Amino acid sequence: MDIQRPRTSPTLPLDVHRKGREPPRSRSQTFEELVAGQPWGVRNQRWLAARSVLGPVGATLRSADSLRRAQGRLLDRAGLAPQPAPSRIQLATPAFRLRSYGQATGAGRPVLIVAAPIKRAYIWDLGPNASPIRLLLDAGLAVHLLEWLDPSPADVDAGLDRYVERISAAVDATGDTPVLLGHSLGGTLAALFCARYPQRAAGLALVEAPLHFGSDAGAFAPVVAASPPAEWLQEGFGLVPGVFLDVVTAAAAPREFVFERYADLWTSAMSGRLRLHLQVLRWTMDECALPGRLVADVVEQLYRKDRFHRGELVIDGSRVGPMTLTVPLLNVIDPLDDAIPATAITPFHEAAASPHKALLEYRGERGTALRHIGVLVGPGALTATWPQVIDWVANR
């Protein structure tokens, strides 16, 4: 009997830069070309190769996550643990908890804070002197915080759709029509919910939350363009370790997340803000993995294809984009932020169908360890920016 030898997979030409040949526009295209049009067996071999490489790396990174959390607990013993305001659990699920603050009745406009699923939600309430939540409470608002929990292996396939579904459950649990408030990726998720279900929100206040993606949308764009398809991360990692996201962030914006952080340590010591710097540093050690599908959706659907800004993203069976965001809209931008610059926000803001729109600027300050977090914890932000945000929220 003749034995058929397996076909070898075709290789890419090595002369892509020779005269007359168009070089690939980005590494992402090259990776896609590796599998495009090839037999299923070849494609499957490449997925298995990704898993065999990333699997052991993932185990190492998960150990690094555990080590960093242990380091954080040591800092807790040094007096740097968060000091949150009293709250109660309004809703508990395996994926998130809804915390409610203040009086259940007689409070003012309800506000639902959608925390970013990266790191921990207590950055919104580090302590008495670094807490937007306490400022909202002092203004008489009914405050709720959607706090994401560590994803389980069953959550690997939880993408943007699932996260919007969970926000929907949290909105229901507030028992009212709240203003949604979010920072960074938490704000992006809140925007997706409001664009899909505008009738269920009284307004949307976003703090340095990316809405427009693509080549002109900040430091992450070149990293995404030079990366293989993000589904490889889902296949290789399952749950993407927090340390991996730290490395990607530092590679994308080293000035903001590496060099300026160390410079801020020195200036914090000189300006009497060392404790705040160390509190934020302790928070950065509270690593949290993300579902592989969520990472893949953010990278592919948002950053690579900019589908939300283009109005091409489908959430719960319907397209969402600027044209479906019809709730009052507030955006806080930092024009000097490398990670989420104004160009990642203002094009969407201008295109949004919201009848009432407002734009505020925050230009950073020393003593907050990370510029991107300064708007949540900085004394300047809390005394100058947040009173304007609260006034806007209270008048929805």
Language-model segments: residues:
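Alpha/beta-hydrolase-fold enzymes
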Residues: 1-52, 175-176, 189-293
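Conserved acidic catalytic loop of the alpha/beta-hydrolase fold
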Residues: 149-178, 191
